[in-house]
Amino acid sequence: MNKVILMGRLTRDPQVRYTQGQDSMAIARFTLAVDRRGRKQEGQQDADFPSCVAFGKSAEFVEKYVHQGTKIVLTGRIQTGSYTNKDNIKVYTTEVIAEDIEFAESKVGSQKDPEEQEDIKN
C-alpha cells in the first residue's frame, strides 16, 4: 500500500501549467512545509519540505484557492522516478502525487486562532 497524508503550509505560490492538445490538463507543483513531531533543543520546530504534484481538477483547485502560507491536508501517494539532466547525470526524484486536497483551516480560523480548524473538501 502506498498512501500518504500530510498537513502543512505551502512554502510559495504553486506553479501551474497546462498540457497541450485538445484535452489539456492542469498540473500544479508546490512544496509543503510539514512540521515534525517534537521540538529541537532550542524549542524550534523541525520541518520537512516534500515536493507535491496535483493533476486535473485538483490542480485547478490549487491554482484558484491555494497560495503561499495556505494550510492544507493532502492525501496521496509517493512516486519515484529518474531522468538524465543536460550534463548527462542521472537525477532521482521523489514526489507526493496529490489525490485529495482539503483546507486545514478556514480564512477566519487562520486569522484568529490556529487551534480552531474547519475542513473544506475539494
Where are these regions (language model features)?
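Short, acidic/hydrophobic/Gly-rich beta-strand patch recurrent on exposed beta strands
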Residues: R29-V34, S51-A54, T94-V96
